[in-house]
Amino acid sequence: MKIGSLAVLPQKSYAINLLIFKTNIVNKKQAMKVAKLLDAENNILRWNIDRQDVDRVLRVEAVNIGTREIISIIQDAGYFCEELAG
């Protein structure tokens, strides 16, 4: 099951980064905890967690936010998070 969110930006040109991470978020309750934190970040446009994937993949589309910030958000919530090599 995938859980995610989508934000709408004003009409402007932005460089959107696609960031992909391995996590240990395995159930809906954990995903909802992380959802509150990711949704609170204005620079995160869209995200989803594929809990059926063996790596529990978190994909984030964002502007002006990097890998370290996303990892920090997930780790501060108490979960494992590392960038997957692309």
Q: Where do the model's predicted regions map?
A:
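A generic structural signal for beta-strand entry/edge sites
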Residues: 18, 55-57
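RNA-recognition motif
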Residues: 48-54
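Short beta-strand-to-loop capping motifs
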Residues: 23-25, 59-64
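C-terminal structural segments of small proteins and small subunits
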Residues: 63-86
